[in-house]
């Protein structure tokens, strides 16, 4: 199976965990798109009744186009389960997210969810975080000074730009700075450091967050229990 087939596989597996009446956090990214399609099929074919809370405008639009009811996070009092993707997951089930420039909303939804599930193809499972650039969402005001501070700290930062040379904008109209670190040996320490930098709204380290990981492998989906 190619990578897209593996993504479709885990998307279909993940929606088996969605129960009637759930308030579901809906993530963002290429793998989640397959999950939303599979969820739409259950809504259509089984009459599944759920409320979705999306982590990006594009996920909300896709879900609504398939008949899934979407509400804002502030309109619900809890989330039963959030299903999202990840860019890297290490041996301790710590993750990097934000390749789709949605990690701020993703993290807000995740921390308000009773359970979190990540769905990935096998290429996302790594021994150490850091080969994938670590995204930071930063406010535009003073962002060049934030970039310079990060550079002086040795984090090898760069603004994420579009093909036309414009800043990539998040749904909150902020910029993305990617840190090209190579390897992250102490993710909790790094998270604390980044949390202390004025102008950084949120980083893409998702630590001690996920409960279940579904990995798309050539011989089928593998379900991993990360934490209770």
Curated annotation (Swiss-Prot):
GO terms for molecular function: ribose-5-phosphate isomerase activity. Its EC number is 5.3.1.6. The keyword Transmembrane helix does not apply. SUPFAM superfamilies: D-ribose-5-phosphate isomerase (RpiA), lid domain, NagB/RpiA/CoA transferase-like. The keyword Signal does not apply. It catalyses: aldehydo-D-ribose 5-phosphate = D-ribulose 5-phosphate. GO terms for cellular component: cytosol. One of its GO terms (biological process) is D-ribose metabolic process. Keywords: Isomerase. The active site is at 106 (proton acceptor). InterPro entries: NagB/RpiA_transferase-like, Ribose5P_isomerase_typA_subgr, Ribose5P_isomerase_type_A. It comes from the Bacteria. It holds the Pfam family Rib_5-P_isom_A. Pathway: Carbohydrate degradation; pentose phosphate pathway; D-ribose 5-phosphate from D-ribulose 5-phosphate (non-oxidative stage): step 1/1. Substrate binds at residues 28-31, 84-87, 97-100, 124. Homodimer. Belongs to the ribose 5-phosphate isomerase family. Catalyzes the reversible conversion of ribose-5-phosphate to ribulose 5-phosphate. This is Ribose-5-phosphate isomerase A. It comes from Levilactobacillus brevis (strain ATCC 367 / BCRC 12310 / CIP 105137 / JCM 1170 / LMG 11437 / NCIMB 947 / NCTC 947). The lineage of its organism: Bacteria, Bacillati, Bacillota, Bacilli, Lactobacillales.
